[in-house]
Amino acid sequence: MNKLLPALAAGLVLASCKPAVSPGVAIFESFRYEGRDAVYEAHPLPTKDVVYNPILPGWYSDPSFCSNGEGDYFLVTSTFSYFPGVPLFHSRDLVNWKQVGHVLDRPSQLTGLGRQHTSGGIYAPDIKYNPKNRTYYMITTNVGTGNFLVKTQDPFGAWSEPILLPQVQGIDPSLFFDDDGTAYIVNNDDAPGGKPEYDGHRTIRIVEYDVENDCTIGERKIIVNKGVDPSAKPIWIEGPHLYKIDGKYFLMCAEGGTSDQHSEVVFRADSPMGEYKPWHRNPILTQRHLAADRPVPVTCTGHADIVKTPDGAWWGVFLGCRPTEKGFENLGRETFLLPVRWSEDGFPYFLGGEETVPVLVRVPGTRVEGTPTFGNFVVEDSFDGDKLDMAWMTLRGPADGLYALKGGALELTCSPMRATRFETPALLLRRLQHHAFSASTRMRFAPEGSEAAGLLLYKDERHQYFLKVCLVDGAPAIALERSGETLSSQALPKSFNTVDLCIASDDGLTFRFGYAVDGKEMRTLLASVDASYLSTAVAGGFTGTTVGPYAVK
């Protein structure tokens, strides 16, 4: 059934003023994304103070958030080799989130990104607020250049140029500002002496940070070696965050690797430098022990961060995945929200025993308003502004000169830069956020030679589907390409004005690719196309799938 292949004449927005089609240029008059996951239809929000998990669906991994103590919360996630880097979300209540920009929005902040693979680049950003100097800090890893931080006193405005931290080796740095003004950086690094006893043997290290001079002080110290139970040879202790709560220092870390064995664990000490002792009931969050066939499973949970609200409650965000009934997913690691509980012996935790990550979460005293970031929704972009919507991303750089907003449309210039290479192609991508979805566009394009334009489903350089208008044997055609291999093609009329393109899925298991010429009935080019090809289970990597316009020659 073609439940999500609509007649696009009704669903797509037509530009009132249509610019002429220039040679080598594809004109996209509109783009429409619709999510229809059955889980949301089966679980309607019962009251206005209830939200859906995930609060940020789609590939929003490694979340970190902070509070300024005045009712503002800011949240960031990883972007790897996408540009701009590190989306910045703002909320006043932990429920209504709005993207207000990107922390890394110019090439000078993202040096070394140009030749990295899709899952390289920016790892695990951490955002903190320092009340002593009323400054926000974002610290992160650029796989190409090392660890760095940027800062600002106005998070809605521009952030500083990178401050490099060459003494902080490893990944996943996080800042902590103590009550007395002292600051520290904790992060994941190699085994002691660079000599791991087994694969996945890592450490958490700490170093003091000079806030006035923006540099580290003294030697780094190992505060966790291997993990909670060294005798069990735990792997990938990482993603650390340090907090001071009621006079004690709590170190929260991810452990187990970021796949289905992922977890969150906690340690406690009397001093920032340790000795850190693990809670005897660790992990404080995991789903790895639960039955795979449980209803509405969430897997891979971990990499958490917590904040305190003005009323004294604690809340946390963490990443997780929502697999399909066959166990794979294309959405990537998403951002979830849960209240933090406290044990009788004074440790924070999220879930215990057989508890599962809930679909619905009540946040007392709040009210869902406007257009939420979660649940089922429709996004339409008619490209009639002077700036791109913040959801759009390019790869490795700003793609200057390859796209333009003109006459109420998006123009992409066909480029020899290809999405199958470590380059910056002529494309704009947004996150896939639902298993059941449709992504569609209305395009005007007259291909010449090897030119092609259309919609790209992108996981990485080696895993992608391209629904394109091109020439086949010198005549216009619609074709579906899988990472350079043509799967299907059909002839188009010799003369046409617009082509509507649609990629859809009912359940995240397979894709359907369709098209319509000059607003006529939608036709299916190819259905039942394997969706697992783009999944992390097949392709690997740390990102989810993205979709959007693409032009190449």
Please give the residue ranges for each predicted region.
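Carbohydrate-active catalytic/glycan-binding domains of CAZyme proteins
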Residues: 19-553
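Sec-dependent signal peptide recognition
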Residues: 2-7
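C-terminal motif of bacterial Sec signal peptides marking the signal peptidase cleavage site
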Residues: 15-16
